[in-house]
């Protein structure tokens, strides 16, 4: 969440010569192509944005390897998270319908009027905690803040607990979602920050 928001959005918008500025180009391509970004089908050696993204992920994995002897399960979890992020993110931009149905929070990140929301990629729960989830009518929204398909009885409990723990977050999310819908109707696009 933090890395996406700060390193890939805020920093490159302030410093256009940042290697992460290629992420802004990714946003533009996704927006112009109804979420599709063909760059994810290319070799990392032929596409600067893919090169930067994969290099950062490889560096994160390599850098965390030092923790392996003292925190093997944490390190394995980090490796899995990096792999899962790449797999889900790449697949979603090559198959927009998959993204719209399976990771609607990320689809909404690119396709809403304000791309400065919905920072999570693989699961939306942190967007709920940080009050940055915005729902749209253009995706099929998740039915619980974990973003998992849960049995109905469990989903009801998860939603009830989440709304009890995060009432202000849910109110803010609802207000932001309504504002975004109005901006979409008016054709307003908020610039990336």
What are these regions (language model features)?
Residues 1-166:
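Membrane-embedded catalytic scaffold of the fatty acid hydroxylase/desaturase
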Residues 155-191:
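A membrane-cytosol interface segment of integral membrane proteins
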């Amino acid at each position: 969440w933090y890395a996406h928001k700060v390193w890939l959005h805020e920093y490159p918008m302030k410093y256009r010569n940042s290697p992460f500025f290629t992420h802004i180009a990714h946003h533009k391509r996704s927006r112009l192509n109804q979420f599709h970004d063909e760059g994810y089908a290319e070799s990392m050696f032929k596409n600067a944005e893919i090169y930067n993204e994969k290099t950062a992920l490889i560096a994160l994995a390599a850098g965390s390897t030092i923790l392996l002897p003292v925190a093997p399960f944490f390190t394995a979890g980090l490796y899995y998270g990096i792999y899962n992020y790449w797999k889900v993110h790449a697949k979603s931009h090559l198959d927009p319908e998959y993204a719209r149905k399976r990771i609607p929070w990320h689809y909404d990140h690119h396709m809403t009027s304000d791309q400065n929301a919905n920072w999570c990629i693989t699961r939306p729960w942190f967007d709920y905690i940080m009050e940055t989830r915005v729902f749209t009518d253009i995706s099929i929204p998740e039915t619980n803040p974990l973003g998992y398909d849960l049995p109905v009885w469990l989903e009801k409990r998860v939603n009830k607990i989440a709304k009890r723990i995060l009432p202000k977050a849910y109110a803010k999310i609802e207000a932001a979602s309504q504002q975004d819908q109005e901006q979409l109707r008016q054709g307003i696009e908020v610039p990336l920050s």
